[in-house]
Amino acid sequence: MMPGRFSNNRVLVFVSVMVVSIVGLLLLPPITQNQNYHDFADQRTILGIPHFWNVVSNLPFIAVGAAGLRQCRREPAIAVLFLGILTTGFGSGYYHLDPNDRTLFWDRLPMAIGFMAILAIAIEERLDAKTGAFLLWPLIALGVVSLLLWRLTGDLRLYAWVQFFPCVAIPVLFVLYSPKFSGTSYWLIAAALYALAKLFEFYDGAIYSFGSILSGHTLKHIAAAAACFAILRYFQTRQPIRTEVWARETVA
């Protein structure tokens, strides 16, 4: 099979899976926002700042996002990713000052942009460079629409796809297709830290009950920012793998 034909087929399969997964999710009943979500364990006011630690623990996102933008601003998908990380720090900090659905929109919007940007990057680096570049802006638009749809209808189904499809698709891409750049270990570190962040989030209250020092949600922010830093280190240190080797491994 010719390499170009192989590439076209795998792109078609991947895009088809994306479309089918969205349609399948939309066939399920609507998902609404549980209002208990806003009831975080650590609600202390310190230095006049409500929910102090849940607010200030977003500073690492701002630092990582700013560093990424400074170093990677010439590559559109990477720049959008770090812009999403930077604005997540501001959006999440704003949300935690007064947790409610209205402020949660501004927390989730930059995250949706970041999720879609990193999916486009994974497609570009593992599946097909032109497809990844082409899908960047449609995916970003989909992320934005998912949040607008939630605010207009109360339905989180599309946002659920935006958040969780990359968590499934990116590992599959990494398993099935060879890398174009060195540094895959940074992606693995980022994935492990993100999984740890979700674990901290789930055990928010249980962690806070141990001494009432820091809550699980605060630790979630720190672990997630560390995952973003691992991705930053990947882009700072990656080196191209020889094209002919990558092509031979991909076609094999």
Report residues per predicted region.
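Early transmembrane hairpin module of multi-pass membrane proteins
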Residues: 3-136, 143-148, 152, 181-252
